[in-house]
Amino acid sequence: MEKQHSLIFLTGFSGSGKSSIGPLLANSLGYDFIDIDSAIEEQEGKTITRIFAEEGERAFRKLEQAMIATIAERKEMVASLGGGALEHTPTFELISTTGTLVYLKSDPKNLAKRLFHKTDRPLLRSSGTEKPDREALERNISAILEKRSPRYESAAITVYTDQKRIGSTVEELTRKIERFVRKQSSIEQNDQHKDRP
């Protein structure tokens, strides 16, 4: 499967801004947009929370991988991933070999602030409680981030989303992605010229 540098996979923890930044970024780049979680919900006719509750995380990760596989050869598309998508190794490998990974980075304190009132994040609920206190949530986020960090940090492009307007983040991402795609295309063209007899 050929790598498409203009197939942009947005990753980051829940609350990092993928769903709000994704459509604006796609519009800025002139690309199509897909939110993988929303596409799965539409396909399955149930929420992600319900899929986790009824079928478990493993079943959800398989649905997620299959959905990503359907767009793996697309060009000029921004795909917003679920926060834990990269934990599933086959999905991580599929993304790494088919597109460009972009990490929206945010610190645990800011993530906890944004996620405190959300009830639709199945992996963030502490055992036995629907909604943990803010400090417990921050500790939970820090622990999950530590586990996910190596794959998040493998992204070709990283942008910090803390203390920034969404518009500024979109502008920064647009510049970095356009520069990256141009550079990779140029490298590939040079390699093709070298391969010619």
From Swiss-Prot:
UniProt pathway annotation: Metabolic intermediate biosynthesis; chorismate biosynthesis; chorismate from D-erythrose 4-phosphate and phosphoenolpyruvate: step 5/7
Keyword match Cytoplasm: yes
Residues involved in ATP binding: G15, S16, G17, K18, S19, S20, R121
Binding site for Mg(2+): S19
Cofactor: Mg(2+)
MF-aspect GO terms: ATP binding; magnesium ion binding; shikimate kinase activity
Binding residue positions for substrate: D37, R61, G83, R148
Swiss-Prot/TrEMBL GO biological process terms: amino acid biosynthetic process; aromatic amino acid family biosynthetic process; chorismate biosynthetic process
Enzymatic class: transferase
EC number: 2.7.1.71
The UniProt record lists the keyword Transferase: yes
Cofactor binding, per record: Binds 1 Mg(2+) ion per subunit.
Gene Ontology CC entries for this record: cytosol
InterPro entries linked to this entry: P-loop_NTPase, Shikimate/glucono_kinase, Shikimate_kinase/TSH1
Domain of life, per lineage: Bacteria
Primary location recorded for the protein, binned into one broad class: cytoplasm
Reaction catalyzed: shikimate + ATP = 3-phosphoshikimate + ADP + H(+)
Alphabetic keyword roster: Amino-acid biosynthesis, Aromatic amino acid biosynthesis, ATP-binding, Cytoplasm, Kinase, Magnesium, Metal-binding, Nucleotide-binding, Transferase
Subcellular location: Cytoplasm
Protein purpose: Catalyzes the specific phosphorylation of the 3-hydroxyl group of shikimic acid using ATP as a cosubstrate.
Quaternary structure and interacting proteins, as annotated: Monomer.
Family: Belongs to the shikimate kinase family.
Name under which the protein is recorded: Shikimate kinase
Gene: aroK
